[in-house]
Amino acid sequence: MSKDNPKDFGTPSDSKERLKAIETAMTQIEKAFGKGSIMRLGAESKLDVQAVSTGSLSLDLALGVGGIPRGRITEIYGPESGGKTTLALSVIAQAQRAGGTCAFIDAEHALDPVYARSLGVNTDELLVSQPDNGEQALEIMELLVRSGAIDVVVVDSVAALTPRAEIEGEMGDSLPGLQARLMSQALRKLTAILSKTGTAAIFINQVREKIGVMYGNPETTTGGRALKFYASVRLDVRKIGQPVKLGNDAVGNTVKVKTVKNKVAPPFKEVELTLLYGKGFDQLSDLVTLAADMDIIKKAGSFYSYGEERIGQGKEKAIAYIAERPELEQEIRDRVLAAIKEGRDPIAAVPETPALAE
């Protein structure tokens, strides 16, 4: 290789040859590691996979395939009371509305049937298991998935999947890496079965802080590294800002959901949703935000208008106006869905969070 021409080092100099070489390499990578292992970051780079809606139009759009991918593992993690279980139950409600069968493995023994019903979950048809230990939970999950009759299975949560040896041992016993090994072994088996049956598996996870981290994000998730690797989608869900208020009363929170990993569409998309206490995610607020981003609803300063009609000053009044007119809501929803089908995507990618995007 000469110093004057650094491209002599085995690199095709012609742009067409370089493009052909890249395409060949990408084809080889996909053959070796599966479709979705490498892709261009452009919005059109999506895999043709079936999905279950989350109930949020903007989150479905951010996920790139219309919701939680079927036949794959999705991890939903974040701090406490951020909306992780609410999001998982919302997915279950959408799957049931489409005629699907769902299961909820309640390792935390904390599922509230009344709250689940308020989110639209048909609790009479929901399969629920409250296992005694981590091995039992994952074995039940495997049997359900192998049946081929389950559309969505949720595990709440990974942190509560306590290994049998830890439960049977003495308080204070040191059992390093036991839960991580349990997760690694289970996920190796589950990945192939999920792909064959088309079941969407959702693992809810908690975050912990790594001791002694001076720089960067000190947060990490429980259960070792296996889930990070096997998950096709990882969603970071957390509260942001001040509580949403109606008068002087707090009625909800703003929740930020970020796709920190996505093997079925370009990752790093971020959306903000309104989580109302006792009611779940505000789908109308989400619709108004998305319609405004697409210029279907016009926004001039604090005023919102649709067509020639001014519908309110401020987002709350615009939402209240549309809520009183179901036919107007459906018209706006139809226009947003049509725009999505045409390929319009107002949700931009944002930088990743290094510590949790492994």
UniProtKB/Swiss-Prot annotation:
Broad class of the protein's primary localization: cytoplasm
Keyword annotations of the record: ATP-binding, Cytoplasm, DNA damage, DNA recombination, DNA repair, DNA-binding, Nucleotide-binding, SOS response
Xref: Pfam families: RecA (PF00154), RecA_C (PF21096)
Annotated Gene Ontology cellular component terms: cytosol
Alphabetical list of SMART domains matching this protein: AAA (SM00382)
GO MF assignments: ATP binding; ATP hydrolysis activity; ATP-dependent DNA damage sensor activity; damaged DNA binding; single-stranded DNA binding; single-stranded DNA helicase activity
GO terms for biological process, alphabetical: DNA recombination; DNA repair; SOS response
Binding residue positions for ATP: 78-85
InterPro entries, per the entry: AAA+_ATPase, DNA_recomb/repair_RecA, DNA_recomb/repair_RecA_CS, P-loop_NTPase, RecA-like_C, RecA-like_N, RecA_ATP-bd, RecA_C_sf
Subcellular location per the Swiss-Prot or TrEMBL entry: Cytoplasm
Database matches in PANTHER family: MITOCHONDRIAL DNA REPAIR PROTEIN RECA HOMOLOG-RELATED (PTHR45900:SF1), RECA (PTHR45900)
Function noted in UniProt: Can catalyze the hydrolysis of ATP in the presence of single-stranded DNA, the ATP-dependent uptake of single-stranded DNA by duplex DNA, and the ATP-dependent hybridization of homologous single-stranded DNAs. It interacts with LexA causing its activation and leading to its autocatalytic cleavage.
Family: Belongs to the RecA family.
Name of the protein: Protein RecA
Source species of the chain: Deinococcus geothermalis (strain DSM 11300 / CIP 105573 / AG-3a)
